[in-house]
Amino acid sequence: MGRRTAWRHGGRPFAIVATVLCATAALTGRAVAAAETGTPKPYAFAQDATPVQGATGTTDAVRLEPGRTYRSSLGKDGKLYYRLELDATSNAYIAATAVPRPGATVAYSDGVKVSVQDGNSGSCSSSTTAHFGASQSPHPVAAWASREIGPGKYGCQTAGTYYVVVERTAAPASSVSPPSSPDAWDLELSYVSEPRLEKAGSTSAPEVWNSASPEALQGDARPRRGGAGFTTAGALGQGVWKDGISPGQTLFYKVPVDWGQQFSATAELGSSSGGEGFMGTALVMSLYNPVRGLVADVGAGYDGSQRSAALDPLPPVEYDNRYAFNDRISGMRFAGSYYLVVHLAAQVADKFGDGPFGLTLRVRVDGAARTGPAYAGRAVPRDVFDPATGDSVPVRGGMVPAGSGGSDDGTTMKLVAVGGIGTGTVLVLALGVWTVAARRRATPRGW
């Protein structure tokens, strides 16, 4: 009887606790489900990005500091200037990620160009232009430029003031249909400083490396959620991975590649359950190096049947690759996190529906890691060329990295965390109500 009485007295508080927990679990479940629909998310800018306004001339250019990330914007036909104060020993790398706003239209030749110039408008080591390409689908694209210290072809070798020039490129309005949107693009600027070597070495690129196309990995794919920007990229290692991607969506992944290792990747877009037609460039996969410099990209058409695209063979990571004239080789000059960026054209929805569509990534990292070059100082940020930085990265058959969220990205884990905090808070409150109610029932009525 005592036990029955206790359960009867606790019945109402238990009901309260159960009701609250069920409601909270339902809310958490709906939040997680919403995160898993594959709905395109806006670009995830670095949380610590400093807002900065580009100047229309060099006189008012704002100084950028190494190791920092900045957020700016670039208008139509825009040309903006930012200032660098450089020494005579370090290499400076600047990358600008252009992000068209939702609903924008872009043409094949629309893009962003980045260069570093001296006080006489002379271009320094390199400048690049990133285009949206044949997909004509708005998505984040990044271009990079540098001031490098070295012999021969290198200019801008002295310490002093230099300028980053970010330009918006476009074809004449009369040559494209529909015309590009005049809206401003958001910009994310990153600045990395690389120290000189302790001892000067070779100044020519390696002439011999294994350029045969590697076999794509086989095996069951494990789920891994891509991020919505460079700073939220999902961690991958060697293995077969799967995700979902919706038309108009861009997914970011990062893969650690050490000195002497050779990277390769294949992306596969799964078959559609309906629709018809053909798109010449539906899926685009791009590879960026640790300073967000474009190394290579590849595209694939789509007719509703499964399609795949593989990067052309890349050389092992070597310091001396920088002396090559081919971007695909010279870009593989650093150890660190390499970024796989996958975009599915928005126009796919018109022919095959809103998705999400199945995406499989087959990632290889061949070769043993070797000791890197002896730098005379530290890079800024200091861990940018360290592939072991951060959470342990999963390899085929290995462990899922801590903090990566397993098969989910940071957004889902934040939702789970918020749900967990909410559940815990409500549980504590409910238990408090239960305790008070139980004490009142246990107290003699004459009290």
Short names for language-model regions:
Residues C22-V32:
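C-terminal segment of classical bacterial N-terminal signal peptides
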Residues G2-R4, A31-L80, P102, C124-H139, ...:
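Non-catalytic extracellular/lumenal accessory regions of secreted precursors
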Residues Y253-K414:
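Membrane-proximal extracellular "stem/stalk" segments
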Residues T69-R71, G103-A145, F278-P315:
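Surface-exposed beta-strand/loop patches in noncatalytic accessory domains
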Residues M1-T19, G410-G422, A437-A438:
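N-terminal export and membrane-targeting signals
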Residues S90-A92, P151-S175, Q261-F263, I329-Q347:
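Noncatalytic modules at the cell exterior or secretory-pathway interfaces
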Residues N91-G103, F263-S272:
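A short beta-strand element within beta-rich, extracytoplasmic domains
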Residues V418-W447:
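C-terminal membrane-anchoring or membrane-association module
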